[in-house]
């Protein structure tokens, strides 16, 4: 599938600032499920950006503005061809050992209830078991828009029985740890047929299975990633995989608008 993506993030500030710095994980990389034909980021400071690949294989740009305006617009766009691999990515080009993803964060720390759910689907076949985990999470945690916030943990969302894609991914990561399976948070895009505009950035998870390598799972949609998905970055949880992380020296409030448009090209 040939997809054209345009992802614009607009920050509005109440008052001018004296310094702003952003770390961007907005550039997707080639992998067995996608080929990135072109990709560009437009933002103040991109001409002097520091660009590097971090230990998890993410393409990162570090930009800054010495005298930032009251509005900051960051636009990422490009063309990607995707293939349905059943979610299987295998061994990717990254320095990190998969076992580091057995380490919990505050957002992916498990609970007695999550551990019990994970134990209830313990099976001898790891792939079958992780599929069962995905189904159990989707069944027990309903997708409800605006039912959580950026700081909601896996344990809190599971106890509430509601969440969004971020919460489903965090719970999945915590549940996999109960079976000693490394799992991580993934950000990217999901193309929805008959929808010209995506609601927002999407998130899912990946589990590392000894015979397959990294395999994607999207509990929010009860499926493994298909050719409708474009993988952008990964991390231990939502904050560590966020597409934009920034700081600004400013006394006023911040207002954020995100617009994502994904179109299929014939």
Report the location of each language-model feature:
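Structural beta-strand/beta-sheet cores of well-ordered domains, especially the beta-sheet scaffolds
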Residues: 1, 7, 22, 39, ...
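Linear, non-domain "peripheral" regions
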Residues: 1-116
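Hydrophobic/aromatic-rich core segments of domains that either
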Residues: 135, 167-252
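Noncatalytic linker/hinge segments flanking ATPase motor cores
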Residues: 46-53, 65-67, 81-84, 114-122, ...
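A broad, low-specificity signal for short, low-complexity segments enriched in glycine/proline
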Residues: 1-4, 32-41, 144-146, 164-169, ...
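Secondary-structure boundary elements
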Residues: 89-90, 96-163, 171, 179, ...
């Amino acid at each position: 599938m040939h997809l054209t993506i345009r992802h614009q993030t607009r920050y509005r500030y109440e008052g001018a600032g004296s310094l702003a710095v952003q770390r961007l994980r907005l550039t997707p990389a080639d992998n067995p499920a996608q080929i990135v034909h072109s990709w560009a980021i437009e933002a103040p400071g991109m001409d002097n950006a520091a660009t590097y690949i971090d230990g998890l294989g993410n393409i990162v740009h570090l930009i800054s503005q010495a005298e930032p305006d009251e509005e900051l617009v960051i636009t990422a766009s490009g063309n990607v061809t995707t293939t349905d691999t059943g979610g299987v990515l295998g061994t990717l080009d990254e320095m990190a050992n998969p076992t580091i993803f057995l380490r919990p964060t505050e957002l992916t720390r498990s609970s007695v209830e999550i551990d019990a759910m994970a134990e209830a689907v313990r099976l001898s076949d790891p792939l079958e078991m992780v599929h069962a985990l995905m189904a159990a999470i989707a069944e027990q945690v309903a997708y409800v828009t605006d039912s959580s916030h950026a700081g909601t943990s896996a344990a809190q969302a599971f106890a509430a029985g509601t969440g969004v894609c971020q919460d489903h991914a965090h719970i999945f990561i915590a549940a996999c740890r109960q079976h000693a399976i490394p799992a991580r948070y993934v950000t990217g895009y999901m193309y929805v047929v008959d929808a010209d505009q995506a609601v927002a950035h999407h998130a899912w998870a990946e589990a590392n299975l000894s015979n397959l390598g990294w395999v994607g799972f999207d509990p929010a949609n009860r499926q493994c990633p298909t050719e409708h998905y474009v993988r952008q970055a990964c991390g231990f949880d939502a904050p560590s995989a966020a597409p934009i992380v920034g700081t600004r020296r400013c006394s006023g409030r911040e207002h954020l608008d995100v617009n994502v448009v994904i179109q299929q090209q014939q």
